[in-house]
């Protein structure tokens, strides 16, 4: 709402600063560090630390993926629209509180004309985040993370068709690795479903295979929904003149009525179904997870902007590629995803493909501008993630 770093969450948020000189509203003002220089603990040592910013970004991304998987993994869970609506509501409330507290200073007043122009983009966003949660519901975290790479390929060739983009040989090689990692991941998943429990459990194998097929179908839809959202947003965003928090605010605000209407129409709101979705033994944890997932959209965006500010957009891109590995491993650790030779190989190939892709983008940017990427204007969190995704 990637990565693309936790792509669906980041693309749901920022567009980018209107100028290179525009500072992130959460970050310390000039001179603030000097005033604190004599204090026992200098906060600027933390806020200006590249290592801490990278660690914070990685932890925020991992926690968001793990939280989403936990919330939608219940055996009877079927309220995805409602879950996403709560995410958006929590995010909007958090933005308003931050604005009232003076932490956000560049959020423009609501503009009805801009909202009407942006509404079709919000509909595409609903399709993207809904199919994302459905895919995550049926697939393991490692497989989900690996298959998300395919979105980069679709967006890249969408760029070629509609925006005159280009695909370099090194980027094409990374695409081949992404496809290979997805094929290996699917093969490993299917093999484990068919033979992991032995022939005596053929009924369970059939059920597991059916679940995987549903997950792959939702993942395929998510790839094209994400590409449609990113490419359409790029076309519209230029005339909107949105700043950082404007995009996040409109994206979440405009999706709230759509998500609630879809929930009331397509989801079962009977007391019996609500009890199944929120069983007494896990109800409090689920509610806390839903609230945190809304706050995490802000955490990820802030940590991304922080990482770019104290490092560079190049470092941020590389961190996003490297972050694929711990996100995939988190699925093995927290959700007991099957650890097989095939699954580990797929994770490794996907990890390498991300590094090759980031390297290809660095080389492409260098050849275009004939300057080091570190001298280019610093971009905000999702501005960079959207650019990484859309300018493949």
UniProtKB/Swiss-Prot annotation:
Residue intervals on the Lumenal side: 67-76, 140-142, 192-210, 268-285, 338-340
Topology Cytoplasmic: residue spans: 1-45, 98-116, 166-171, 232-246, 307-314, 361-392
Record's compositionally biased regions (Basic and acidic residues): 1-11
Keywords assigned: Cytoplasmic vesicle, Endoplasmic reticulum, Glycoprotein, Golgi apparatus, Membrane, Sugar transport, Transmembrane, Transmembrane helix, Transport
Subcellular location: Golgi apparatus membrane; Cytoplasmic vesicle membrane; Endoplasmic reticulum membrane
Residues of this chain annotated as glycosylated in UniProt: 268, 273
UniProt-listed InterPro entries: TPT_transporter
Region annotation (Disordered) ranges: 1-25, 373-392
Residue spans crossing the bilayer: 46-66, 77-97, 117-139, 143-165, 172-191, 211-231, 247-267, 286-306, 315-337, 341-360
Membrane topology: Multi-pass membrane protein
CC per GO annotation: cytoplasmic vesicle membrane; endoplasmic reticulum membrane; Golgi membrane
Record-stated family: Belongs to the TPT transporter family. SLC35D subfamily.
Subunit structure: Homooligomer.
Record NCBIfam families: nst (TIGR00803)
Function: Involved in the import of GDP-mannose from the cytoplasm into the Golgi lumen.
Protein name: GDP-mannose transporter
Gene: gmt1
